[in-house]
Regions:
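Substrate-binding cleft of extracellular glycoside hydrolase catalytic domains
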Residues: 2-12, 31-112
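Functionally critical loop-and-helix segments that line ligand-binding/catalytic clefts
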Residues: 2-10, 18, 23, 147-214
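Short amphipathic alpha-helical segments and helix-helix/interface helices
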Residues: 16-21, 43-47, 119-123
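A generic secondary-structure signal
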Residues: 20, 81-89, 121-128
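Anion (oxyanion) recognition and catalysis
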Residues: 22, 50-53, 127
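Active-site cleft segment of glycoside hydrolase catalytic domains centered on the general acid/base Glu
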Residues: 106-130
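Aromatic-lined carbohydrate-recognition surfaces of secreted/lumenal glycan-active proteins
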Residues: 127-148
Length: 214
């Protein structure tokens, strides 16, 4: 497998899809599922990206920036909501991944306790919403420590290492190439006469990352 070049952004990319592929050589775009429609991946956008030859990845992210957010019940709710967006809005293919964000420098105690409970809830929510069918795989976005811990505990199949190199375990995780996706510091790119601020990303050269097309 080749190492793929991608980006993530809160911006809708429908009008930029062809140029992102043809002019900048992006292979994939990572977009959002959430309760905020303004930043969410839309069906039209997913179709435009796919038609341009790009793959898509998605992350569920709302308020996962502090320990108190992460509970079993919150995981169930988020897993269920993410399933509905993936299945009913986008038509995301089975077997692909939905990443869930741990967007802070979580301690080992946080990861062993509330964050792991949250991811257990995510699985339960996805399972229940899917009528007892494990339709989507679960990924984690976060620090190296978060990625390593949640994969070792079996509650995340994929890991997306955040750009925050000062977070616990992140530099070691990057050096060991343990990630499926890695995020880099923001950069500005010119597309269709506009300057967009995006986060560059890349896949691991030898592993899939749960990306998809529609």
């Amino acid at each position: 497998m080749a190492r793929l070049k991608g980006l993530d952004t809160t911006l809708e990319l429908t009008r930029y899809a062809l140029a992102l592929r043809a002019q900048h050589g992006f292979d994939f775009a990572l977009r959002y599922y959430s309760h905020n429609a303004a930043k969410n991946l839309s069906l039209g956008e997913a179709r435009a990206l796919s038609s341009a030859g790009m793959q898509i990845g998605v992350v569920w992210e709302t308020a996962g920036t502090y320990p108190g957010f992460f509970t079993l019940a919150q995981g169930v709710a988020d897993g269920s909501a993410a399933y509905r967006m993936a299945r009913e809005v986008i038509g995301q293919p089975p077997g692909s991944a939905i990443y869930f964000a741990v967007d802070y420098d979580a301690s080992q105690a946080d990861l062993d306790g509330p964050v792991s409970n949250y991811f257990t809830g995510v699985h339960a929510g996805l399972f229940a919403a899917g009528g007892g069918q494990p339709r989507y795989q679960v990924g984690v976005y976060g620090s190296g420590l978060a990625c390593r811990t949640l994969r070792e505990r079996g509650v995340a199949a994929f890991s997306w290492l955040s750009q925050s190199t000062g977070f616990a375990g992140s530099q070691e995780y990057a050096r060991a190439l343990n990630y499926d996706l890695i995020q880099y510091l923001p950069q500005r790119i010119e597309v269709e006469g506009e300057v967009l601020l995006v986060d560059p990303d890349a896949t691991h050269p030898d592993r899939p990352a749960g990306l998809f097309q529609v």
